[in-house]
UniProtKB/Swiss-Prot annotation:
GO biological process: 2-oxoglutarate metabolic process; NADP metabolic process; pyruvate metabolic process
Protein role: Conversion of NADPH, generated by peripheral catabolic pathways, to NADH, which can enter the respiratory chain for energy generation.
Matching Gene3D superfamilies: 3.30.390.30, FAD/NAD(P)-binding domain (3.50.50.60)
Activation/inhibition comment: Strongly activated by NADPH and 2'-AMP and inhibited by NADP(+). Ca(2+) increases the activation and decreases the inhibition effect.
Stated name of the protein: Soluble pyridine nucleotide transhydrogenase
Record note on cofactor: Binds 1 FAD per subunit.
Enzyme Commission (EC) number: 1.6.1.1
Family indicated by similarity: Belongs to the class-I pyridine nucleotide-disulfide oxidoreductase family.
Localization in the cell: Cytoplasm
Amino acid sequence: MAVYNYDVVILGTGPAGEGAAMNASKYGRKLAVVDSRRVVGGNCTHLGTIPSKALRHSVKQIIEFNTNPMFRQIGEPRWFSFPDVLKSADRVISKQVASRTGYYARNRIDMFTGTASFVDERTVEVVTPSGAVERLVADQFVIATGSRPYRPSDINFNHPRVYDSDTILSLSHTPRRLIIYGAGVIGCEYASIFSGLGVLVDLIDTRDQLLSFLDDEISDALSYHLRNNNVLIRHNEEYERVEGLDNGVILHLKSGKKIKADALLWCNGRTGNTDKLGLENVGIKVNSRGQIEVDENYRTSVSNIFAAGDVIGWPSLASAAYDQGRSAAGNIVESDSWRFVNDVPTGIYTIPEISSIGKNESELTAAKIPYEVGKAFFKGMARAQISNEPVGMLKILFHRETLEILGVHCFGDQASEIVHIGQAIMNQPGELNTLKYFVNTTFNYPTMAEAYRVAAFDGLNRLF
């Protein structure tokens, strides 16, 4: 059995693992990373963020072609099969793997392929795909193994018509009708993607509102546009059982309803990838969803073992995971690169997309904070008219007296890009966080960023 010694060993090469590895390597630590795949990137690159967003982009291009009258001179509306559209995602994945492999090579980080499990607090054992066993001994460890779709034991995911958000990327046909169970972020994103391909979608929501953590107005706008694209949303429903057929599935709901479709996509929750880590050997416990509890330093209950990314739960975003991993490594090397990642913008890649940061109206009302609202509707923005993307708005919530920006909410094209301007101003100290910044700053014209100036003037006009 080969034994290797390192300063830090990182389990996983997704965003959290990469963030930890890159930061620790800058401080001269001898590092190794372990991943179950032969290629880096984790589920984010291979099954989650990258393929789903590349898929969304392709579908959005199809929608633009089919709805823009100018293209009728070229040909009639075209519909593409799901496998054909998925090919564009494959091209992006290969480019991402090449780029990220270069990062590890340039920083002289050793890479091991296999399944890792803890032997004790200083040792992990790696079983390679060939069955060989290697031991890695280190002073510190970072667990960044990510998560996977939650699979209830009473549903047969081996049935050829039953998928989760990982296996849906292997779908070899385009269903005419699809049931999506779970109306969280992933469920809503795939509802947009499949409806954009002309698939009839039944979106089953276990709650009474889509994405209830969003501002009510944004949530309502999402519901409207999904329904406008032939998505049938069913709120307050729970499954009783899933019946697999030769040519489809029937979803039996506890309300007594039955829904038949060509396929079922299960999008109801995720589970941390911790079951094979041998955490019982080091005394680390996980919750019912397999997630590890950490403190504000991303340290687990074992002082030399840290954890970051989806494996610790909220917010389960690739953007946050990278910073969490970087911060965990910052604690290991005792640098000033540490921070607890809590103020994270939300990016939801539906069609149109959604992004927000800060408080929403319900939260401010409950806290009895005197706020006002400024809005800019995209249909009045020159850039939106030029790009034929009139749907959406930017909404700024600010304090009536101090003009401090309390929240920014955006629905529409480029929402996940636009939100960062508001985020930058909200992060300014004291009086520098003010709505006046947007009225006293010259924006390029025409741009979508100009919506901040329009929304700011709208908000100021409401004051008296």
